Amino acid sequence: MSSSPDSPPILHRLPRVAIIGAGRVGSTLAQRIAEKNLADVVLLDIVEGMPQGLALDLLEARGIELHNRQIIGTNNYADTSGSQIVVITAGFPRKPGMSRDDLLRTNAKIVVEAAKQAIAYSPCAIFIVVTNPLDVMTYLAWEATGLPRNRIMGMAGVLDSARFETFIALELGVLPADVKAMVLGSHGDLMVPLSRHATVNGIPITELLDAATIERLVERTRNGGAEIVELMQTGGAFFAPASATSLMVESILLNQSRLLPVSVYLQGEYGLKDVVIGVPCRLGLNGIESVIELNLSDSEREALQTSAQSVQKNIERWHSTQHS
C-alpha cells in the first residue's frame, strides 16, 4: 500500500549488528560482517579508544574491500540501539593449561552485565553468545535478558564442526568444503562429534578411515581450542570463531534457514530440560526457527546427556556463588 503525500516517509534502515567486546574475536567478526556486506557494525568495548581505533582502521579499508558499511567504535551502549543482532564476545581468553570452565567466575559477571545493557537498547534483537565457557554463558545471558529461546543462542557447534571437518580433510587430503560433519554437546572436552554422520562428498568417513584414526581425529577436535592456546601462549583462536559466528549472522539476516549446530535452551528435546547445549537448529530471520532432533545411537545419546550434566553442574556452581 502506498503512503499518502502527508504521511511520514517509510525508512528502511540497513541492518545493524552490535558486537560487545572488541578483542581479537570481536574485531575479526566486525571485519567479516562488514566485508561480507551483511550489516552495519557497532563495536563496543570498555577500553576507551580501542573500539574507536579499530572501527577507523576498518573504515579505511572499505574502498579496498569494495563495501560501504558503516562501522562505529564506542564505549557507550546507547550507540548499539536498535541492533537486529547482538553478539557478546567480551570476556577473558584462556591461557595455557586452562579449561573453558576455569573462566566461569571471571566471565559470568561480564556477560550478564553486557546482556542486561544490550537488551535495554535493543529489546527486539537476537543474541549470539561467544564468550567461554560458552554453554553456561549463554544460559546466564538467557536468564539476564528474559528472551524467548529462539532469540538467544551460543556459537560453539559451528566452530567445533569446522575443526572436525578440517582434521578429516587433512587426514584424507581432500578439500575441506567436501567434508560435512556435525558436533553436538557442550563446547569443551565432553563435546559429541557424530562420526557416523561425517561424510566426504556423501561417502561416510567410516568407509574411508579406520576406527582408530577416526577416534584420533575426534580427540583432536575435542582439544582443538586447547591446541591453539598451547601454540600461541598469549590467547586463543579468533579467525575460525569469527568465521563461525559470521555464518550464523548471515543465516539469520538473509533468512537462509541453514541447519547448523548451535547452543540453545532445551525444553525436552533429546530428553533434556533447563540446560543450554549444542544441537542442530535451523537459523532464519526469527533466530532459531526450529530445533532438530536427530535419531541418535544409545552411545551418542548417553554422551550428550553426560555433556549436558556437566553444563548443569557449572550453572549450579555459578548460582551457588550468588547466594552464598
UniProtKB/Swiss-Prot annotation:
Give the E.C. number(s).
Answer: 1.1.1.37
**For substrate, which residues are the binding ones?**
R94, R100, N132, R163
Top enzyme class, one word, equals oxidoreductase
Catalytic residues, per the record, are: H187
- Any GO BP: lactate metabolic process
Taxonomically, which superkingdom? Answer: Bacteria
**Could you tell me which Gene3D superfamilies the record lists for this protein?**
Lactate dehydrogenase/glycoside hydrolase, family 4, C-terminal, NAD(P)-binding Rossmann-like Domain
Q: Name one Pfam family in it.
A: Ldh_1_C
Identify the residues that bind NAD(+): G21, A22, G23, R24, V25, G26, D45, N107, V130, T131, N132
Listed under catalytic activity are: (S)-malate + NAD(+) = oxaloacetate + NADH + H(+)
Q: Does the keyword Oxidoreductase apply?
A: yes
Example of a GO MF term: L-lactate dehydrogenase activity
Q: Which CDD domains match?
A: LDH-like_MDH
List the keywords (alphabetical).
Answer: NAD, Oxidoreductase, Tricarboxylic acid cycle
So what does this one do?
A: Catalyzes the reversible oxidation of malate to oxaloacetate.
Report the HAMAP family cross-referenced here: Malate_dehydrog_3
> Record's family?
Belongs to the LDH/MDH superfamily. MDH type 3 family.
- Identify this protein by name: Malate dehydrogenase
GN (gene name): mdh
